[in-house]
Swiss-Prot record:
Originating species: Escherichia coli (strain K12)
Cytoplasmic side stretches: 1-25, 88-95, 145-162, 206-244, 311-322, 371-379, 432-439
Identification of the protein by name: Membrane sensor protein UhpC
GO CC entries: membrane; plasma membrane
Keyword terms of this UniProt record: Cell inner membrane, Cell membrane, Membrane, Transmembrane, Transmembrane helix
Localization in the cell: Cell inner membrane
Stretches assigned to the Periplasmic side: 46-66, 119-121, 184, 266-289, 344-349, 401-410
Length: 439
């Protein structure tokens, strides 16, 4: 690893309580705002292509199967990258790891806008997926390092809204760009914005509290659950921690299988939702993408409710809130599918409620993985479940495109309804699991 990418060493520990408190308050706000902005732009460069899909299909640039193939390639590569990057990011300098990854995705989006062949699109989108994996594990590690167990749900939920803001704005940006300049201009705009913010991350983001001379967050907040997690596995090597607390941890595997199904639903609605609106209601690209924006708006609110509720109502136990939201996914998907009449307002409302319920488990499962693992393996644990999440998302690409071609939208909704129902069943063992960490 290049020297500047290595995690910074611990600085001499401060002793002045007032200075420690002041620095913790400043850096906790600063870290959250910085990773929030960075991840929102990761989302811009991840969903730029999806937002342009109706325009690309209308222009005959790619077929529906081509679109599904690119989505599947992206999700598989992104899932693998999240796991590998999670392991690497646990011992890397957060500011450069995340910043360089974002700059790379920006450059690739610009190149995508200049490309014309399916092979060029495929190669560039696989590369984009690889560098996209440099974002989320870093954020998970920093959220675990700067915020303790009994408060983390609320802070993690605030960061998680970056998904929704990025996901809500990029369809509007792409639709406006496509309307006036073509979809390629939208890809280039997203890429340029990502490069600027990536440079900002390299400049202003910081690593763990200990690298700034601060005590661990559990000691600072006197959080017994956090201190207990910090003290687990003392004396183990990184390889032993990874094996015991991630690869052989049954709770991590159960969360992973559940994540597969949650992401089938999330990716299906996110990637095919605008096409569903276009084909069933005959609306234009701007109107169709507005429905996807409602999905993200619902997710924005749902993530905040899920994070706050798991902290305040269940004392940091993510299981009950996860189950409630998983049941909500099934009901809201069924409402969109079985709606007896075609109405933009009602369908957009269903997109909102699906987003509300999907982004609860989307956030809480990743957080639960970090908390069910070792403190020094937070990035690896979230990366591991993320690998399975995007294997699930890949099923919403080419395989779901084939379902659409054969059984049309009825087959589409049958698949995602089954996925939602099974995901709820897999979360039952977590109802009473407060701190399951090892096998």
């Amino acid at each position: 690893m290049l020297p500047f990418l290595k995690a910074p060493a611990d600085a001499p520990l401060m002793t002045d309580k007032y200075e420690i408190d002041a620095r913790y308050r400043y850096w906790r706000r600063h870290i959250l705002l910085t990773i929030w902005l960075g991840y929102a732009l990761f989302y811009f460069t991840r969903k730029s292509f999806n937002a342009a899909v109706p325009e690309i299909l209308a222009n005959g640039v790619l077929s529906r199967s081509d679109i599904g193939l690119l989505a599947t390639l992206f999700y598989i590569t992104y899932g693998v990258s999240k796991f590998v990057s999670g392991i690497v990011s646990d011992r890397s300098n957060a500011r450069y790891f995340m910043g360089i990854g974002l700059i790379a995705t920006g450059i690739i989006n610009i190149l995508f806008g200049f490309s014309t062949s399916l092979w060029a699109f495929a190669v560039l989108w696989v590369l984009n997926a690889f560098f996209q994996g440099w974002g989320s594990p870093v954020c998970a590690r920093l959220l675990t390092a700067w915020y303790s167990r009994t408060e983390r749900g609320g802070w993690w939920a605030l960061w998680n809204t970056a998904h929704n803001v990025g996901g809500a704005l990029i369809p509007i940006v792409m639709a406006a760009a496509a309307l006036h300049y073509g979809w390629r201009a939208g890809m280039m705009i997203a890429g340029c914005m990502a490069i600027v913010v990536g440079i900002f991350l390299c400049w202003r983001l910081r690593d763990r509290p200990q690298a700034l001379g601060l005590p661990a967050v559990g000691e600072w907040r006197h959080d017994a659950l956090e201190i207990a997690q910090q003290q687990e596995g003392a004396g183990l090597t990184r390889k032993e921690i990874l094996t015991k607390y991630v690869l052989l941890n049954p709770y991590i595997w159960l969360l992973s299988f559940c994540y597969v199904l949650v992401y089938v639903v999330r990716a299906a609605i996110n990637d095919w939702g605008n096409l569903y609106m276009s084909e069933t209601l005959g609306v234009d690209l701007v109107t169709a993408n507005t429905a996807v924006t409602m999905f993200e708006l619902g997710g924005f609110i749902g993530a905040l409710v899920a994070g706050w509720g798991s902290d305040k109502l269940f004392n940091g136990n993510r299981g009950p809130m996860n189950l409630i939201f998983a049941a909500g996914i099934l009901l809201s998907v069924g409402s969109l599918w079985l709606m007896p009449f075609a109405s933009y307002v009602m369908q957009a409302t269903c997109f909102f409620t699906i987003g509300f319920f999907v982004f609860g488990p989307q956030m809480l499962i990743g957080m639960a993985a970090a908390e069910c693992s070792h403190k020094e393996a937070a990035g690896a644990a979230t990366g591991f479940v993320g690998l399975f999440a995007y294997l699930g998302a890949s099923l919403a690409g080419w395989p779901l495109a084939k379902v659409l071609d054969t059984w049309h939208w009825s087959g589409f909704f049958v698949v995602i309804s089954i996925a939602a129902g099974i995901s709820a069943l897999l979360l039952l063992p977590f109802l009473n699991a407060q701190t399951p960490r090892e096998a």
